[in-house]
Amino acid sequence: MVGSIGDRMLAITLPHVSSWNAWHAWFGNDVDGYLPLRDRIDDACRKAGREPAEVERTLALLVAFPGALGRGSAVTEAQPDPIDGDPATLVPMLRGFAEAGVAHVQLVLDPITVESIAALEPTVAALAG
């Protein structure tokens, strides 16, 4: 797996990796922002001699629950608006990413608490059903 959008790093790694991962800040934390990035990675795969379908797509999404304070970090890039953790918002968003070819999603929860994790249960149930 590689988690980069730098041209040089993609050229070095894409001939060898089985998957590529995107961070939420790179695509604005929504499907519409992800699509041009996906297309860019598809082009980078072809330049590296790979079919885009050979490289699994994964990404991280920022999801807010009650008590969210924002994700403080040393990252200098602007942070996108978080996705509301309510299943009515989160389920269609996750399905949209699946339709866009994303095979695996990591949810970056804000806050990272037992309550936030438990609040994901209806979303998981809806996606599993």
Give residue spans per PLM region.
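Active-site-adjacent structural elements that line small-molecule/cofactor binding pockets in enzymes
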Residues: 1-129
